[in-house]
Amino acid sequence: MVKTNTNKLTDDQISEIKESFDMFKSDNGKLDNDQIKYAFKALGCEITEETLELIKKKGQKSISFNSFFELVSPYIPKRDSMSTLEQAFKLFVKDGSGITFKDLKKVAINIGEECSDSDLYDMIEFADTDGDGVINKSEFISLMTTKKVL
């Protein structure tokens, strides 16, 4: 695995890596190979099959946050933020038309997130600013670039 200088990453980038890891991790607190791929894509990065094979050859069935951080952090400064958001959008929908309830439910199931149908509909309603029942790319980008205020 690649060692990196965390000084090259901003606090926001480090938080983003942690959020991606937390979103896809298993109950054991680690990522398996499929979850690693999803977490990379959510960050707008692509992991090579060769890298995944190296992980397997080391006998690892899953990796910890520290290993994931070392693996993904060299990719973070090189990515373009708009293409990152477009990659994340594509995680939800394959045809590019928008994120539907069905798409959101499928992703929730794939990442092991237990959400009620009501919660999923609330998420869509919150992000769907034009009221058509679908989260289009611009709504998704707007949602993802809005600072959370707590």
From Swiss-Prot:
Superkingdom of origin: Eukaryota
Molecular function via GO: calcium ion binding
Signal sequence segment: none
Protein's GO biological process: centrosome cycle; microtubule cytoskeleton organization; microtubule nucleation; mitotic cytokinesis; nuclear envelope organization; nucleus organization; regulation of centrosome duplication
Stated role: Plays a fundamental role in microtubule-organizing center structure and function.
Misc. comment: Binds one mole of calcium per mole of protein.
Recorded family membership: Belongs to the centrin family.
Protein name per UniProt: Centrin-B
Originating organism: Dictyostelium discoideum (Social amoeba)
